[in-house]
């Protein structure tokens, strides 16, 4: 009985060791991510067109017309704004 328990413990240890070795060798833990703190408005608009995840229609989301701001939100007006560099862009806003 004691021999079976020790064999079972060794088998579990071996499986855990093999799994952690394979995961480490696959390079998942070595993945590097580069992020920007302030994304320029042009890239934000591109993100909005390519990845439309805004189902609820949040405030300050990029838009091109009022129809882009529809959803379950109070901010249903697309308003033009200017950033600190003088570039103009449009976001969903509470007031027209």
From Swiss-Prot:
Cystine pairs annotated here are: 59-75, 63-78, 69-92
Q: Which keywords, in A-to-Z order, does the entry hold?
A: Disulfide bond, Knottin
**Entry keyword Plastid:** no
UniProt xrefs under InterPro entries: COpept_A_inh-like (IPR004231)
One Pfam family named in its UniProt record:
CarbpepA_inh
Expression tissues:
Fruit specific.
Q: Where are the transmembrane segments?
A: none
Domain free text: The presence of a 'disulfide through disulfide knot' structurally defines this protein as a knottin.
Record's miscellaneous remark: This protein is sulfur-rich (Met and Cys rich).
- What name does the UniProt record give this protein? Fruit-specific protein
Q: Which organism is it from?
A: Solanum lycopersicum
Provide the organism lineage as a comma list. Eukaryota, Viridiplantae, Streptophyta, Embryophyta, Tracheophyta
């Amino acid at each position: 009985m004691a021999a079976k328990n020790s064999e079972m413990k060794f088998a579990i240890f071996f499986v855990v060791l093999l799994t952690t070795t394979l995961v480490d060798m696959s390079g998942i833990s070595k993945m590097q991510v580069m992020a920007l703190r302030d994304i320029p408005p042009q890239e934000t608009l591109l993100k909005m067109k390519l990845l439309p995840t805004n189902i609820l229609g949040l405030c300050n989301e990029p838009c091109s017309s009022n129809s882009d701001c529809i959803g379950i939100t109070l901010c249903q007006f697309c308003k033009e704004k200017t950033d600190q560099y003088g570039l103009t862009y449009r976001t969903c806003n509470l007031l027209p």
